[in-house]
Amino acid sequence: MGSTGEPDRKRRLSSSVAPGGGAPVSPAKRLAVAPTSEDKKLDFTVLKYKNQKLSEQLEAHKFEYRALENKFAGLKEKQRTHNETLSLVNSSWEQLVADLKSRSFCKSGSPNSSPGSGHNNVQKDGTCAPIERDTLRSLVESGATESSGCLPGCHLGSDAPPLHLSTANALGDIFFPSSDLLQANEECALAALTKLPENDRSKQLQSTSSNLLSSLNNVVQALSNLQLKHKQLAEDYQNQRDSSARKRAEHRRLKEELASAASELEETNYKLAALKAQRDNTQGARIPYPTLGNKNMPEDKVRDKQREMQDLEATHKELSELISKRLVEIKRLHEERIEILNKIATFQNILMDFKSIRSSKAFQLVNDRLQKSQAELDHYQTLLEKLQVDKDKFVWQERQFNLKVDLAEIPERVSTYCESSIADLKKDIQKLCDEKNMLILKLEEASREPGRNQVITKFKALVSSIPREMGAMQSEMTKHKEASLELNSLRAEVHSLSRILSRKERDNEEASCRSARAGSDITQLQSVISDLKQTNKELKLFADMYKRESTDSREIMESRDREFLEWAHVHALKSSLDESKLEQRVKAANEAEAITQQRLATAEAEIAESGQKLGTSRKDLVSLSHMLKSKQEECEAYRVEVECIGQAYEDIQAQNQQLLQQIIERDDDNTKIFMEGVKAKQTQDALHLETYSLRRNLQQESSLMDLYNQKIVSLEDQLKMWSDRVGKLQEDGWQQSVSLSNYQRKLVDVHRDAQKLMQSLDGIQANVGSSRLEVADLLIELEKERFSKKRIEDDLEVMSRKASSLRAKARESAVLEKLRHEVKEYRGILKCGICHDRQKEVVITKCYHLFCNQCIQKSLGNRQRRCPSCSLSFGANDVKPIYI
């Protein structure tokens, strides 16, 4: 408060008062005065003035100290309530962490499993996947646990890392398995839904699953919103802590300044008492003064006394006239000051009238633009939400397509099995052809050889076995035909899937066009915001120009400058508030646009990959169709060959019948024995072939059964998990609906409270305007009372002077000489130390030397403004008028 420079000022004053007070005086006007008494009186008056100033500063410091104490008590009360709420929040947070741990134990299966044991985010190839872990760490460190250790008087120290670690572990147990489970459940649900028959129950199950997924997404969004609100509250609390620390530091600084001011005041009081005692001692001694003429002659003394009395009367008249002029001038200045105070009060009321500000054209224009921009932002947000919904639908359909492709692999396996069986049949046919050729050769040899009866019997047995083999081959051919029909159905299904994929590609292109339109709209909104900022800058420039155009007096200019500064501050606050809101909305829109563009890019990449996969699947399908055609042609060729063999067999059978008729009678016994051996051999070979084929078929069927059993078990497990998940989601949805209704009721209450607060704000503003008018009236009355008090004091001083002059006339000559000496001393004090003619009218506040106004104005006109007594530099603001 400027207390450090007071001793220097006292030293300068004590060193500079002597030359100013001891300046030479004209002998024609006044007598010489001792410099020591003048210096002492100047020191006394200056110290008295300083003492008064310091007492005023001390009172102001005391008032500020009381206000700060009240404020500090209020802050302590707020801190106490805040500590209570914070302790409650900490307890609830610990309870939440415990609940999370219990839920994580339930999800992991055993309480001994740690979060890092099952979810360490390490892949099979050794690479880490730290995305979810980083997200969890940011959630725990910045948002959730930020309010758990921010008490001003307590620091957690070593307790904070275990709390963070436990929270991170609990959240890891909740989130990391849930993400894997969600992904696995989605895949299983898609597989189960695609395999369900198309009836009312399956459609109802699909609708309920989609509703549950949407409610789950809403719950996740609500959790993210709660985390953001928690983070904002933690930031607000940190700001309150910083402000309270700053206020405590200011409180300590003001205490120190108050103590220093009190010590300085005591020092000045001590010096003032010493100077008073010294003055009382000096006033008791008489000071001889020279007189004009001869001292020994009494007539000269009488004449001198009369002349001095006349001079005293003349000076008294001059002083009375000067006092009357000064009083008139003071009255005029007082009236001007009252008028200025009235104008300032009216200007303050105009500036703080919020209704007039709201009704202004500029405010209405800015408000309309803000409403338009808000509507456009809402429109763009709806467009972005629609794009997000379309993208989610596309992802869902793409997953369905992938599931259908996976299901299409099963007919491919069946076709490969059919091809392997066809190859086996070809081998069997080839063996039969070879056996046929061998039989023909044996028949020819038997016809040539004498033991043809045995050959004939063998041939009969073979002929009897050929029809059975032909029936088996025909059954296998029918099976192959059925497999070819299934392949045609699979082709039709692949064709339908390709058409669905092309349709989805067209939908994706339309979505990209919509996103491009949304980006152009966002750029237009940004240009509108830049125009608003430019108009705000122009308005500020107009305000500055209007500020510079004023040509009134200095005091009016200062008041207008203060008015314009307050007005600019109000507008700056409003514009900063509006711009911050706009910037937040634009940032949110830009972030949403960037997210949609990223998602669109990923969707396009996935579409390109699916297109490539579809192309490869089409190529594979074409190659398989060509292979099937070739196999069908080979089957037709085999069929023709079998028919040819049958016809040849019929011809041979006719010939054999003729031959048999010739040799039946001779070779009956031999044929019976040979037929029995051939039958036994044929049955043995047939049994071997049947056992081999049955074993091979049994192995293939067992492998297929194992595969289907595994799929059935996995689907049953997934169905159980999904049923449990559906129950949990239904419970969560019910809880969320209850909480949503509660939040809606709270929102309605908040809106009602806001309306009441606005109404109370209008009433308070009206009361503030009336109170300002009352304060202005009180200030005017106070100025009037001060002026009247000053007039009374001046009148009292004049009357005291008159009484002293009357007493001086009635006293003896010694008293008259003493009065004359005192009058001369006062003249020396009142007259200027430069011109020694005019009265002292102004004071330099840096060194407290008194001079007349004209001499000081001359020194102010110079480039180097220095005090004539102590050569201390000063400015125009350091010169203050005084009334003596």
From Swiss-Prot:
Disordered as annotated region, ranges: 1-37, 107-127
Family from the record: Belongs to the BRE1 family.
Note on domains (UniProt): The RING-type zinc finger domain mediates binding to an E2 ubiquitin-conjugating enzyme.
CC annotations in GO: HULC complex; nucleus
Zinc finger (RING-type): 832-871
SMART domains the record matches: RING
Swiss-Prot/TrEMBL catalytic activity: S-ubiquitinyl-[E2 ubiquitin-conjugating enzyme]-L-cysteine + [acceptor protein]-L-lysine = [E2 ubiquitin-conjugating enzyme]-L-cysteine + N(6)-ubiquitinyl-[acceptor protein]-L-lysine
InterPro entries for the chain: E3_ubiquit_lig_Bre1, Znf_RING, Znf_RING/FYVE/PHD, Znf_RING_CS
Keywords, sorted A to Z: Chromatin regulator, Coiled coil, Flowering, Metal-binding, Nucleus, Transferase, Ubl conjugation pathway, Zinc, Zinc-finger
CDD domains: RING-HC_Bre1-like
Record GO terms (molecular function): protein homodimerization activity; ubiquitin protein ligase activity; zinc ion binding
Phenotype when the gene is knocked out: Semi-dwarf plants, early heading, and partial sterility of spikelets due to defects in the anther developmental program and pollen formation.
Protein task: E3 ubiquitin-protein ligase that monoubiquitinates H2B to form H2BK143ub1. It thereby plays a central role in histone code and gene regulation. H2B monoubiquitination (H2BK143ub1), mediated by HUB1, modulates transcriptional regulation of anther development, likely by promoting histone H3K4 dimethylation (H3K4me2) in the chromatin of the key tapetum degradation-related genes C4, CP1 and UDT1.
Keyword hit for Protease: no
Pathway as given in its UniProt record: Protein modification; protein ubiquitination
Cleaved signal peptide residues: none
EC number in record: 2.3.2.27
Subcellular location: Nucleus
Compositional bias (Low complexity): 108-121
Protein name: E3 ubiquitin-protein ligase BRE1-like 1
Chain coiled-coil ranges: 49-86, 216-541, 580-663, 696-762, 789-827
Subunit structure: Interacts with SKIPA. Interacts with HUB2.
Listed GO biological process terms: cell division; chromatin organization; defense response to fungus; flower development; innate immune response; leaf morphogenesis; positive regulation of cell division; protein monoubiquitination
